[in-house]
Amino acid sequence: MKKYIFIIFIFFSEVTHGQTLQPLENNTLEDFFTDEKASHTVLERCISLYSAITELIKIKHPELASEFYQIANTLYPYGIISFSKTRNISYEEAEKFFFTNVNNLTNLYIDEMKKNGEKNKSYFKMSFIGDDLRFCHEVTKSFNLVISELNSE
């Protein structure tokens, strides 16, 4: 039991202290659909970005915030499945870790977007975050298309 708690402590320490946002520019749609690790990374980042946008705009633009929230929640279970596969752990275990990772990344995105907003009067202008959002939009569109095709078979 002590060993298990120690491993969890080490994992959370790495997650909370060592994480910085890197642009998603090195990822491709092909990688997303063919590489489980890339898929997990992209899902985690896109869900976090959508969640950060939801938090930042929910007062001024509640309908738009609701749309971003729905997109994040649609992708969320697939992120957990992907995390479970890449870490070879149960869905329940993956869900706990994934939630923590997404929460931490969401906070990093919020901080970055606020800094950029103060500097450029825009959350996205002159920042990699706008490029990440465009990439996440393409991923989400493609992902939804694949899911709807699988459901129609």
State the predicted function of each range:
Residues 25-31, 116:
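Domain-scale activation on soluble regions of proteins
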Residues 4-14:
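Sec-dependent N-terminal signal peptides
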Residues 18-26:
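Cleaved targeting-peptide boundary
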Residues 11, 53-54, 143:
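Generic hydrophobic alpha-helical segments
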Residues 34-89:
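Short N-proximal segments of mature Sec-exported proteins
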Residues 76-153:
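Compact alpha-helical subdomains of small soluble proteins
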